[in-house]
Amino acid sequence: MATTVTCTRFTDEYQLYEDIGKGAFSVVRRCVKLCTGHEYAAKIINTKKLSARDHQKLEREARICRLLKHSNIVRLHDSISEEGFHYLVFDLVTGGELFEDIVAREYYSEADASHCIQQILEAVLHCHQMGVVHRDLKPENLLLASKCKGAAVKLADFGLAIEVQGDQQAWFGFAGTPGYLSPEVLRKEAYGKPVDIWACGVILYILLVGYPPFWDEDQHKLYQQIKAGAYDFPSPEWDTVTPEAKNLINQMLTINPAKRITAHEALKHPWVCQRSTVASMMHRQETVECLKKFNARRKLKGAILTTMLATRNFSVGRQTTAPATMSTAASGTTMGLVEQAKSLLNKKADGVKPQTNSTKNSAAATSPKGTLPPAALEPQTTVIHNPVDGIKESSDSANTTIEDEDAKAPRVPDILSSVRRGSGAPEAEGPLPCPSPAPFSPLPAPSPRISDILNSVRRGSGTPEAEGPLSAGPPPCLSPALLGPLSSPSPRISDILNSVRRGSGTPEAEGPSPVGPPPCPSPTIPGPLPTPSRKQEIIKTTEQLIEAVNNGDFEAYAKICDPGLTSFEPEALGNLVEGMDFHRFYFENLLAKNSKPIHTTILNPHVHVIGEDAACIAYIRLTQYIDGQGRPRTSQSEETRVWHRRDGKWQNVHFHCSGAPVAPLQ
């Protein structure tokens, strides 16, 4: 019987040191090659937990990375398989993310943005010349070689990259990160190299003003904006940007990929190749301020998602082998959330723009006019139940990358039963109609309390709202929003995920559901609401109240609360408080002045309906925010609220809060 020889080449040739990044099935560690003393970043993937498809993607990524040898691309130096583990040895990139470096600069101009996009385009051009399409260009994947001034920009994470022949256009699957997806991908048409140029256009837009061109709280509307090319250049921030810069953006964000500028052509654009005479040298302080908020929002979302995914060991679409290389600031596992329709759906995209009717190509675009800073800090609220199979129902969005290469319209049962392998992404994706794999940037370690709570979410099962066993088919009183996606054998993923996000529950039926209106009255029809609908209404109203608190909006808060509101809360030192004056003090002196981004998570809300006009909700509330030193913090409270409906509107008449104060005080 032959003896199997186990490869130990990595162990023999490299010495491992400290961790610089971590994912669900991988870790990135600094290493030194013994024979030369050179430092690298080793991405160590636990292959014992990978599926056959994950192995194929790992091989594809390694193969692509070997092809790419360019000064603006994180380079793969070695790929070694040992028993149970695969080692990818990349450049050790120590400069952190490009966007983080920009906000730390004392001076930043249009000419600097031109230099940044030039390096990004050089990297993209090399990829395209080598027959590679990156498919996930975004700020998290743009790193700096070192902390030295003028360090080169490095493109990282080729976990979603594909190989193409020449200018081949084909359907390679639904992949990318929501705010950076091109119209052709969203329309599920054949695509190719132009998708990378579209993403470059989005990045350039952000580099110039600090917020993205496309953004909406509703992901469906976000995709509609992108497909329509609905962006604009609002005053006053765009008034100081040169016409040449706007012209390049317009050529990059051209809806028709055949007419979109190529990387080679973009590098010859006067704003890029003649920046010293064409690009403005004026310092863009407002852009830097907006970028700070943009970065803070990305980091906060990334921290939450990273914790969720790493804790729950999701392994869906792929195991990123990306050059997570790298720096403490940009490594991490690119986790595929693809088939994971049950995981983390995000309602908000990466952006920060408030809505207006101003637009370039459509009347439905968004614009950052006037109130950008508040919009950039708009608090987010996530609701996490303990539903069937541990699905997370969320109303918030992250930078999740998505990848769905198998089919345009997966079967409902496939989607709903897909939390199986895990490799988590930022994402998504993310996420498009279905969340997926993308790289995470390492962040300060989240509070242990978060992971403890998330572990409990992972262990949880059962739908919080259910008061009895679930039936095999849809309940008799489902809303049209849920019945819609189930009315055909192959519904759109986004419809299903939207219904999950709205808290309508997980469809159980695998067969076709009857088409047509539901047997019970829709929630929009006057009269008593079905209990499940009323419970969702209570949860939604509670979210609105918490958003008003996080926004420091006393007027909105007062509209939701009864004037005689009574409460027990930590701030009152155990005393029963009646009326609004006690709360007004915090709004006027603390909440209204809070300039830090806030994210609120409502864990396992339980609603008790008391007759037709009263209800009680109990939940755990996590408030995540950035403290004065720029570090992520978390506070927790346990809350109960009593609601009474008057004149068709729910009002909070009493609440009881224990634990930490409601408002973050740092």
UniProtKB/Swiss-Prot annotation:
It holds the Pfam family Pkinase. It is found in: Cytoplasm, Cytoskeleton; Cytoplasm, Cytoskeleton, Microtubule organizing center, Centrosome; Sarcoplasmic reticulum membrane; Synapse. Activated by Ca(2+)/calmodulin. Binding of calmodulin results in conformational change that relieves intrasteric autoinhibition and allows autophosphorylation of Thr-287 which turns the kinase in a constitutively active form and confers to the kinase a Ca(2+)-independent activity. Induction: Activity is induced in skeletal muscle during exercise. Residues 349-534 are annotated as: Disordered. One of its GO terms (biological process) is regulation of neuron migration. ATP binds at I20, G21, K22, G23, A24, F25, S26, V27, V28, K43. CDD domains: STKc_CaMKII. The modification Phosphothreonine is found at T287, T306, T307, T400, T401. It is a peripheral membrane protein. Its EC number is 2.7.11.17. It catalyses: L-seryl-[protein] + ATP = O-phospho-L-seryl-[protein] + ADP + H(+); L-threonyl-[protein] + ATP = O-phospho-L-threonyl-[protein] + ADP + H(+). Residues 283-292 are annotated as: Autoinhibitory domain. Residues 14-272 form the Protein kinase domain. Keywords: Actin-binding, ATP-binding, Calmodulin-binding, Cytoplasm, Cytoskeleton, Developmental protein, Differentiation, Intellectual disability, Kinase, Membrane, Neurogenesis, Nucleotide-binding, Phosphoprotein, Sarcoplasmic reticulum, Serine/threonine-protein kinase, Synapse, Transferase. The modification Phosphoserine is found at S367, S394, S397. GO terms for cellular component: calcium- and calmodulin-dependent protein kinase complex; centrosome; cytoplasm; cytosol; endocytic vesicle membrane; neuron projection; nucleoplasm; postsynaptic density. InterPro entries: Ca/CaM-dep_prot_kinase-assoc, Kinase-like_dom_sf, NTF2-like_dom_sf, Prot_kinase_dom, Protein_kinase_ATP_BS, Ser/Thr_kinase_AS. Residues 354-369 have a biased composition (Polar residues). The modification Phosphotyrosine is found at Y17. The CAMK2 protein kinases contain a unique C-terminal subunit association domain responsible for oligomerization. Calcium/calmodulin-dependent protein kinase that functions autonomously after Ca(2+)/calmodulin-binding and autophosphorylation, and is involved in dendritic spine and synapse formation, neuronal plasticity and regulation of sarcoplasmic reticulum Ca(2+) transport in skeletal muscle. In neurons, plays an essential structural role in the reorganization of the actin cytoskeleton during plasticity by binding and bundling actin filaments in a kinase-independent manner. It is linked to Intellectual developmental disorder, autosomal dominant 54: A disorder characterized by significantly below average general intellectual functioning associated with impairments in adaptive behavior and manifested during the developmental period. This is Calcium/calmodulin-dependent protein kinase type II subunit beta. The gene is CAMK2B.
